[in-house]
Design a protein with these regions (language model features):
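Catalytic pocket of metal/acid-base enzymes, prominently hydrolases
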Residues: 1-24, 119-139
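Histidine/acidic residue-rich metal-binding segments in metalloenzymes
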Residues: 3-94, 98-114
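Glycine-rich, acidic/polar active-site loops that bind/position phosphate-bearing ligands
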Residues: 118-303, 307-326
Length: 326
């Protein structure tokens, strides 16, 4: 796994290779210390990203954000512009990397704005690395209204992590004056059900809502306690292996897989990561699970209670604080 881990992620190793040394150092300072992004380096960063992306067959880019829909959103744009001579050239500027203006009128907003106030802004989050899905360069971003209100889950999370670091650092100074910041770590556990695609297609309630709304208990539920940590079925294990390979290529550090308590319920858990990155990886993994499951003639159910009479799927969040001194 270490050979292909983060193969499609513009991580620090890729940054060091594709960026000028002074640009690399400034960008690392932004990531590690939260300093303000210098717009003067944006063009150089964008050029490095584009070069790496094109070497991996990428033709499009997108600002990848998390609106209030319990999923992710993206709009793909090609790396093409007119060259002024009747032809086209590939182009990706720092301006396109740092900020875009997607239409925000049709996203949930909690009633804080009118529908006709359509403008929204997506802004690059440098602390979460850029990655490649198929032929698209995905740039993690926050999503806000033109008046500054958050229209996503990432912006409030980043604000809370900053506030928590400041408060925790003040406490640490009573004991360790050398502490400069406190990082929040997160290890999530993704539980899910797998259903054969043919059986899924026979249930309109599953197709429309992702859970059962009618029917009765199956002949055997979880009374025998024989599914938890049991032998993983061969077909399910093939799905898990495929999922883990693709997840590792996207930098998601998958660690544990096993049968859960309910029949056809399973779990995947990663190694702890910085909280913002861990949340991005969980959102990415849930999207990836659906794609890989379809390839193996499964449908994955992520609803917290898809079946009555058996355990639901929780998402335990193992949360901790860590100082910059270790």
């Amino acid at each position: 796994p270490s050979e292909y881990f983060a193969k499609y992620v513009f991580n620090r190793q890729k940054m060091y290779k594709y960026l000028p040394s002074d640009v690399y150092e400034k960008l690392i300072d932004v990531i590690d210390n939260g300093t303000r992004l210098d717009r003067s380096i944006a063009d150089a960063v964008a050029a490095g990203m584009k070069l790496w992306a094109e070497e991996n067959g990428v033709t499009h880019y997108t600002h990848w954000f998390q609106p209030l829909t319990e999923g992710t959103a993206e709009k793909h744009d090609a790396f093409v512009e007119h060259d002024g001579k009747g032809g086209m050239i590939e182009e990706f500027s720092g301006k396109l990397l740092v900020q875009q203006e997607p239409d925000a009128s049709s996203f949930p907003n909690g009633g804080i704005r009118n529908t006709f106030e359509a403008r929204g802004y997506s802004a690059w989050d440098p602390t979460s690395p850029v990655f490649i899905i198929d032929d698209t360069l995905c740039i993690p971003t926050i999503f806000i209204s033109y008046t500054g209100e958050a229209l996503d889950y990432k912006a409030p999370l980043l604000r809370s992590l900053h506030t928590l670091s400041e408060a925790a650092t003040e406490v640490c100074h009573y004991f360790y004056p050398q502490v400069k910041k406190v990082q929040t770590n997160l290890g999530w556990e993704q539980e899910y059900f797998l259903v054969d695609e043919s059986l899924y297609s026979a249930r309109p309630d599953l197709m429309l809502t992702g859970r059962t709304l009618m029917g009765h208990d199956s002949a055997k539920n979880q009374q025998m306690d024989d599914h938890y940590f049991g032998t993983i079925p061969e077909r399910v294990q093939a799905f898990m292996k495929d999922l883990e390979i693709q997840a590792l290529e996207l930098g998601i550090p998958c660690k544990t897989r096993h049968n859960e308590v309910a029949p056809n319920q399973f779990e995947l858990a990663p190694i702890y990561e910085e909280c913002n990155l861990a949340v991005d990886h969980n959102m990415l993994l849930m999207s990836l699970m659906k794609r890989v499951a379809h390839k193996h003639s499964f449908r994955v159910l992520l609803h917290e209670k898809p079946f009555a009479g058996v355990n639901g799927s929780g998402k335990h969040n193992n949360w901790s604080l860590c100082t910059d001194t270790g």
